[in-house]
């Protein structure tokens, strides 16, 4: 069983024919919906299709809503795009104007107040660079330092400048309400800067009936990196969003930051996603570059919970091939990892709480007995996530009583979710879990399993029991 999970972004390419179904059957664990683009009507169609297909194939594919967040974008050009030449003058304005080769509006209405002369402005992931030379009223006058073509609604980054944009815009709130109504499983919080950003979003979700949605903080700028420890504590997972990060932060720092974040998030027992440009050339080509294949493999060696495809599946020419390639790279890389050694090394960083002690003992027992699988019986998913933290070599079977918990566990490293239905007698649950694993071909007679759970069942965060069981007829 592949341990590293795969997130696929849905878009026009996945709307065609049976592409979405093929993504599911090829290894997609989570469907990402990017709310920086597209309409509610189109996103609802995609969510409905995911729901229908996961029911058809009995696959717990989760839905992740990715917010627009406190980002800055260009507005629109009269001719949709313009080409800027190095050395020319160009103006960004917070006034509402029609874009030309000389001026264009931006979405942040107070940008002229936040920015200063000498600031660098990067457009379209840094492909075009401007230097601020003067600020007059609402107009920001710039000199083009790196020319190129820019088009409608391209992203704008301003490294080193703390912007006064609220973390949650009115659009973000509307998007979250839509996500609650559609029963999404995760929200990816774009441009997370502080733990307070996450707390604000959690409060909004709770106030509107979405407290069971898990929040993934996207780290995309230096402020988020500086506050990474408190952000990890506040959220349920981290996305290393290397696109904007690589614009806001020097490129040579990104691999170092990626490895640092992955290590910290694993130690916290939470999910970590490595994202952006992983197989970017497969937007146009049926095979990735060798550098891209190595990039995916290196993230897996680092222990990432999931790798993510963005434009490759949303708008690329080879979406299904991209998922299959990512799955192949993951499966091959995982065969080379010495999980026992990693487990022994990680013991040095163990939190001495009851749950950690039981989960550590569960994994240690599984190694000692050469167990086929670890079975966690869980109401909230907590037990399974804590086992996943230790990255055991055997399968982790996450037996949950709730469909949403099953889908959320489908993002956790190494966890194979199984729905058991409600039952409050612990040994009945264990027997039901064994039978479900036998039914799905995960276990057979004679296999050794290590079972862990919290007793009494239903009290979240109380993993306190370990049981060894040999599968019988």
Model-predicted segments: where are they?
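Non-catalytic helical/linker scaffolds that mediate oligomerization, partner binding
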Residues: 1-473
């Amino acid at each position: 069983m592949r341990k590293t999970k795969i997130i696929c972004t849905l878009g026009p390419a996945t709307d065609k024919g049976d592409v979405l179904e093929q993504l599911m059957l090829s290894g997609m664990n989570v469907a990402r919906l990017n709310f920086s683009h597209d309409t509610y009507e189109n996103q609802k169609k995609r969510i409905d299709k995911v729901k229908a297909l996961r029911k058809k194939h009995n696959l717990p594919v989760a839905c992740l809503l990715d917010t627009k967040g406190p980002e800055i974008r260009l507005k629109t050009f009269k001719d949709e795009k313009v080409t800027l030449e190095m050395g020319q003058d160009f103006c960004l304005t917070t006034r509402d104007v029609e874009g030309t080769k000389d001026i264009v509006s931006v979405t942040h209405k107070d940008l002229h107040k936040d920015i200063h002369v000498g600031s660098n402005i990067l457009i379209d992931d840094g492909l075009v660079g401007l230097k601020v030379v003067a600020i007059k009223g609402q107009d920001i006058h710039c000199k083009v330092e790196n020319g190129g073509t820019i088009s409608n609604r391209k992203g704008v980054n301003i490294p080193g400048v703390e912007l006064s944009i609220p973390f949650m815009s009115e659009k973000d709130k509307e998007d979250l309400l839509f996500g609650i109504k559609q029963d999404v499983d995760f929200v990816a919080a774009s441009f997370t800067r502080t733990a307070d950003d996450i707390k604000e979003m959690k409060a909004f979700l709770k106030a509107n009936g979405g407290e069971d949605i898990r929040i993934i903080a996207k780290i995309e700028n230096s402020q988020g990196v500086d506050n990474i420890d408190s952000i990890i504590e506040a959220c349920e997972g981290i996305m290393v969003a290397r696109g904007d990060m690589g614009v806001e932060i020097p490129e040579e720092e990104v691999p170092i930051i990626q490895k640092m974040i992955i290590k910290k998030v694993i130690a916290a027992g939470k999910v970590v996603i490595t994202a952006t440009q992983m197989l970017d050339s497969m937007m146009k080509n049926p095979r990735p570059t060798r550098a891209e294949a190595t990039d995916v493999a290196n993230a897996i060696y680092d222990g990432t919970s999931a790798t993510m495809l963005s434009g490759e599946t949303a708008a690329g020419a080879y979406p299904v091939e991209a998922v299959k390639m990512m799955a192949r790279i993951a499966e091959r890389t995982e065969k080379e990892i010495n999980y026992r050694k990693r487990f022994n090394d990680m013991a040095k960083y163990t939190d001495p709480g009851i749950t950690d002690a039981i989960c550590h003992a569960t994994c240690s027992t599984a190694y000692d007995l050469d167990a086929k699988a670890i079975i966690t019986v869980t109401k909230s998913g907590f037990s399974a996530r804590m086992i996943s933290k230790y990255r055991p070599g055997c399968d982790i079977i996450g037996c949950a009583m709730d469909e949403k918990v099953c889908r959320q566990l489908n993002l956790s490293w190494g966890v194979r979710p199984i729905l058991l239905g409600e039952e409050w007698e612990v040994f009945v649950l264990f027997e039901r879990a064994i039978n479900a694993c036998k039914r799905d071909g995960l276990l057979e007679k004679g296999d050794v399993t290590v079972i862990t759970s919290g007793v009494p069942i239903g009290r979240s965060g109380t993993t306190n029991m370990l049981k060894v069981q040999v599968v019988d007829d």
